[in-house]
Amino acid sequence: MRIEEDLKLGFKDVLIRPKRSTLKSRSDVELERQFTFKYSGQTWSGVPIIAANMDTVGTFEMAQALAGFDILTAVHKHYTVEEWAAFINTASADVLKHVMVSTGTSDADFEKTVQILALNPALNFVCIDVANGYSEHFVQFVAKAREAWPTKTICAGNVVTGEMCEEPILSGADIVKVGIGPGSVCTTRVKTGVGYPQLSAVIECADAAHGLGGMIVSDGGCTMPGDVAKAFGGGADFVMLGGMLAGHEESGGSVVEENGEKFMLFYGMSSESAMNRHVGGVAKYRAAEGKTVKLPLRGPVGNTARDILGGLRSACTYVGASRLKELTKRTTFIRVQEQENRIFNSL
């Protein structure tokens, strides 16, 4: 046993220090980025935000809507091959280039992903998703996926420390997903005592990944557009959002009514709700590590997407970054004990 004395920080612990800017308008900021990935060799351009691969966020409908904003969607792994085929038959090439195919690490997951990718060559992204990216089985699966799909861009996770961020990259991942426990409906930290403050995880993993020519996606912990800006400022190449995109018409959650008001259910993918729906319940040897919440219906996701992108543009103007690519090198974080004046938050 040992204790690390270094303080680790989350998004709530910092603000971005404003700097001199020559920008005249938020409209001068370019949010689109262009990446060429280490192993796949694919070049992609767009806004590097990803809708999370949760079945109450990463839906086909969400992919259709967010493609119009140049945003990616990691479509959840619980759609059947037949449902994928129906979606591909109606989706445009532009939508498909904004889609990531999510998979677990079982043999059945692998075979299903093989079938999905065979449906259309425009599906260029694979998202390998496990809660604990510290297992040897996960790293071996990444290597297997790279061998099977040499031209696909592979995103894999989750990890939170620099040394383990390197492992999936060395095994064939182009992008590593960073985050254990920061999600709004994740209870891993309270059930297990395991986790890592998200901003520090992003900073440390970005340093490790970039040294190997890889990239990272900050997954979880964002509650507002300012957190998205902080994630990019900390070195994230992509930012994945779950709770911020939940509760919309395109989100796919079940709608319930209470006292004449309608709500949409949103739950973590390790919650009892998710396991009851997809695997027949919580196995006797494990505990649920997620919760279910009821969100007031939020309408079309387009309004939220505009708010996020607008906040991101504004953050760039405050530090003089004319392009999102410049935000990291123009970011100085200051530690704080308050984020906002909350006097009217309860009204």
Curated annotation (Swiss-Prot):
InterPro entries: Aldolase_TIM, GMP_reductase, GMPR, IMP_DH/GMP_Rdtase_CS, IMP_DH_GMPRt
SMART domains listed in its UniProt record: IMPDH
Similarity comment: Belongs to the IMPDH/GMPR family. GuaC type 1 subfamily.
Keyword tags: Metal-binding, NADP, Oxidoreductase, Potassium
Organism (species): Salmonella choleraesuis (strain SC-B67)
Entry EC no(s): 1.7.1.7
Membrane-crossing segments per the record: none
Record protein name field: GMP reductase
PROSITE patterns attached to this UniProt entry: IMP_DH_GMP_RED
Binding locations of K(+): 181, 183
